[in-house]
Amino acid sequence: FTLDPADYRGLGAAIVIANPNAPTSLLAPTAAVEEILQANPDRVVIVDEAYVDFAGPGASCLPLVKDYENLLVVRTFSKSRSLAGARLGFCVGQPGLIADMNRVKFSYSPYNINAMSEAAGAAAMEDEDYFRRTVAAICETRAAAAAGLRDRGWQVLDSATNFLFARPPRRPAAEILEELRRRRVLIRHFDAPRIRDWLRISIGTPAQMQRFFDALDEAEGAAPAAR
């Protein structure tokens, strides 16, 4: 599931990279992103860093913005800033690229975000202590959840996000999904090549994760449903 810069040569279009990735939860090193930038100087490279605050120091591509006119880094308030309902985000790029974006914006939609979302976003940026405590708590619970899955024989990728991407050791992922759903526990499964054997598990509170593991232990021991 790792990012290979060679795959992004000569595409002839703008390039969008989710880093950390969803749904795999993996983080590509900034050196790999920089290699893509250098190989595509005439293409805009958009790096979606929705989950980067859960990845630790040095994960963001923001420091590269000053060196690359074709780099646009986008962020959201929906994850680490706890404002999913506000539909709020921002982007960072060099002045010329931002000016181009504004021209496109004003050509079809001159309206900005609503006042309540703007106020909530400003308040979230000011409360750095709450942000850091929240991220630290999620990362701590993530580590415990990953250990719990590995103890049960699951393959768990090293997550840089607020979720885990894991493969069950015995039963098909789709069956585990349905068994958990019967127990009113919801996770995600993507019926697509390469990842249909994997499950995406969001990190909740410690109590919520215990509820997940209780249901999982039942689900893994349940007889397959008749078809």
Where are these regions (language model features)?
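Active-site pre-lysine segment of PLP-dependent enzymes
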Residues: 2-11, 23-45, 49-83, 95
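Structural motif
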Residues: 14-18, 46, 90-92
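PLP-dependent enzyme catalytic core of the Aspartate aminotransferase-like
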Residues: 31, 178-183, 187-188, 192-227
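PLP-dependent aminotransferase class I/II
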Residues: 70-150, 154-157
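Short acidic/glycine-enriched loop/turn segments that link adjacent beta-strands
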Residues: 85, 160, 194-197
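Short beta-strand-to-loop capping motifs
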Residues: 93, 166-170, 203-205
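Conserved PLP-binding catalytic core of the aspartate aminotransferase-like
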Residues: 138-139, 151-183, 199
